[in-house]
């Protein structure tokens, strides 16, 4: 029995966009960045039971019980009104789940998946749970063949990675901007620790994928292409995924930002290729 718990925003039993192959994707609640372009902004914060969402629910799926916001999954229509109203960028639908409870979901899907990806929010803000979950999977004869990945923003310290890497098969990280000033403008934090995390993971052979998000007029990749290309080449044979920003699902000023087109992505790809970065993955979809 493993009763260690985490606050879980969502479980997708079969995902083909959260790492290689078909995977169970576990989204944890809470993030230590505040990205303007976040497509899951309701996973940033954690519910403080303020109750502001309760009277807004058109299906009466929320109520206050003993001072806590309680969600009724039976009557909920998944209209997401509560997500748009929450001042905390949280969700009343997040549930506390134990390692054993998550493992029960994994076992139901095990015949149809190649692994599990823990995402968020930011997975590593609930690091002890992730370590316990991956350890349990690696120690289970029926589950140990599954690969265990994290989708992370890279803010975890070196000490934290040392705890996670023995039971983690790899991490997928975003480098949202090259310069710290640009990165802080986009996310609220600088990117020095993120760059250190990327280097550490590459050195350990655990950097499954580096991601660059093209946001027209907002990112600085091309302005710093020499440094960026040299940085990526120094990581070794790591796949680099070029993602195209779109405004669907974002809040605030990013709703007015232009979506990225092939004409926005291709100049970056060409500039990287010319400088020896050739293992590129292009967007599967432009919106």
Curated annotation (Swiss-Prot):
<feature type="domain" description="Radical SAM core">
    <location>
        <begin position="17"/>
        <end position="284"/>
    </location>
</feature>
<feature type="binding site">
    <location>
        <position position="57"/>
    </location>
    <ligand>
        <name>[4Fe-4S] cluster 3</name>
    </ligand>
</feature>
<dbReference type="Pfam" id="PF13187">
    <property type="entry name" value="Fer4_9"/>
</dbReference>
<feature type="binding site">
    <location>
        <position position="50"/>
    </location>
    <ligand>
        <name>[4Fe-4S] cluster 2</name>
    </ligand>
</feature>
<dbReference type="InterPro" id="IPR007197">
    <property type="entry name" value="rSAM"/>
</dbReference>
<keyword id="KW-0949">S-adenosyl-L-methionine</keyword>
<feature type="binding site">
    <location>
        <position position="47"/>
    </location>
    <ligand>
        <name>[4Fe-4S] cluster 2</name>
    </ligand>
</feature>
<feature type="binding site">
    <location>
        <position position="35"/>
    </location>
    <ligand>
        <name>[4Fe-4S] cluster 1</name>
    </ligand>
</feature>
<feature type="binding site">
    <location>
        <begin position="37"/>
        <end position="39"/>
    </location>
    <ligand>
        <name>S-adenosyl-L-methionine</name>
    </ligand>
</feature>
<feature type="domain" description="4Fe-4S ferredoxin-type 1">
    <location>
        <begin position="38"/>
        <end position="67"/>
    </location>
</feature>
<feature type="binding site">
    <location>
        <begin position="174"/>
        <end position="176"/>
    </location>
    <ligand>
        <name>S-adenosyl-L-methionine</name>
    </ligand>
</feature>
<dbReference type="Pfam" id="PF04055">
    <property type="entry name" value="Radical_SAM"/>
</dbReference>
<keyword id="KW-0004">4Fe-4S</keyword>
<feature type="binding site">
    <location>
        <position position="86"/>
    </location>
    <ligand>
        <name>[4Fe-4S] cluster 2</name>
    </ligand>
</feature>
<protein>
    <recommendedName>
        <fullName>Putative glycyl-radical enzyme activating enzyme YjjW</fullName>
        <ecNumber>1.97.1.-</ecNumber>
    </recommendedName>
</protein>
<comment type="similarity">
    <text>Belongs to the organic radical-activating enzymes family.</text>
</comment>
<dbReference type="Pfam" id="PF13353">
    <property type="entry name" value="Fer4_12"/>
</dbReference>
<dbReference type="InterPro" id="IPR017900">
    <property type="entry name" value="4Fe4S_Fe_S_CS"/>
</dbReference>
<feature type="binding site">
    <location>
        <position position="53"/>
    </location>
    <ligand>
        <name>[4Fe-4S] cluster 2</name>
    </ligand>
</feature>
<keyword id="KW-0408">Iron</keyword>
<feature type="binding site">
    <location>
        <position position="246"/>
    </location>
    <ligand>
        <name>S-adenosyl-L-methionine</name>
    </ligand>
</feature>
<dbReference type="InterPro" id="IPR012839">
    <property type="entry name" value="Organic_radical_activase"/>
</dbReference>
<dbReference type="GO" id="GO:0051539">
    <property type="term" value="F:4 iron, 4 sulfur cluster binding"/>
</dbReference>
<dbReference type="InterPro" id="IPR001989">
    <property type="entry name" value="Radical_activat_CS"/>
</dbReference>
<dbReference type="InterPro" id="IPR017896">
    <property type="entry name" value="4Fe4S_Fe-S-bd"/>
</dbReference>
<feature type="domain" description="4Fe-4S ferredoxin-type 2">
    <location>
        <begin position="67"/>
        <end position="96"/>
    </location>
</feature>
<keyword id="KW-0560">Oxidoreductase</keyword>
<feature type="binding site">
    <location>
        <position position="79"/>
    </location>
    <ligand>
        <name>[4Fe-4S] cluster 3</name>
    </ligand>
</feature>
<keyword id="KW-0411">Iron-sulfur</keyword>
<dbReference type="InterPro" id="IPR023912">
    <property type="entry name" value="YjjW_bact"/>
</dbReference>
<feature type="binding site">
    <location>
        <position position="76"/>
    </location>
    <ligand>
        <name>[4Fe-4S] cluster 3</name>
    </ligand>
</feature>
<dbReference type="InterPro" id="IPR013785">
    <property type="entry name" value="Aldolase_TIM"/>
</dbReference>
<keyword id="KW-0479">Metal-binding</keyword>
<dbReference type="InterPro" id="IPR034457">
    <property type="entry name" value="Organic_radical-activating"/>
</dbReference>
<feature type="binding site">
    <location>
        <position position="82"/>
    </location>
    <ligand>
        <name>[4Fe-4S] cluster 3</name>
    </ligand>
</feature>
<feature type="binding site">
    <location>
        <position position="121"/>
    </location>
    <ligand>
        <name>S-adenosyl-L-methionine</name>
    </ligand>
</feature>
<keyword id="KW-0677">Repeat</keyword>
<feature type="binding site">
    <location>
        <position position="31"/>
    </location>
    <ligand>
        <name>[4Fe-4S] cluster 1</name>
    </ligand>
</feature>
<dbReference type="GO" id="GO:0046872">
    <property type="term" value="F:metal ion binding"/>
</dbReference>
<dbReference type="GO" id="GO:0016491">
    <property type="term" value="F:oxidoreductase activity"/>
</dbReference>
<feature type="binding site">
    <location>
        <position position="38"/>
    </location>
    <ligand>
        <name>[4Fe-4S] cluster 1</name>
    </ligand>
</feature>
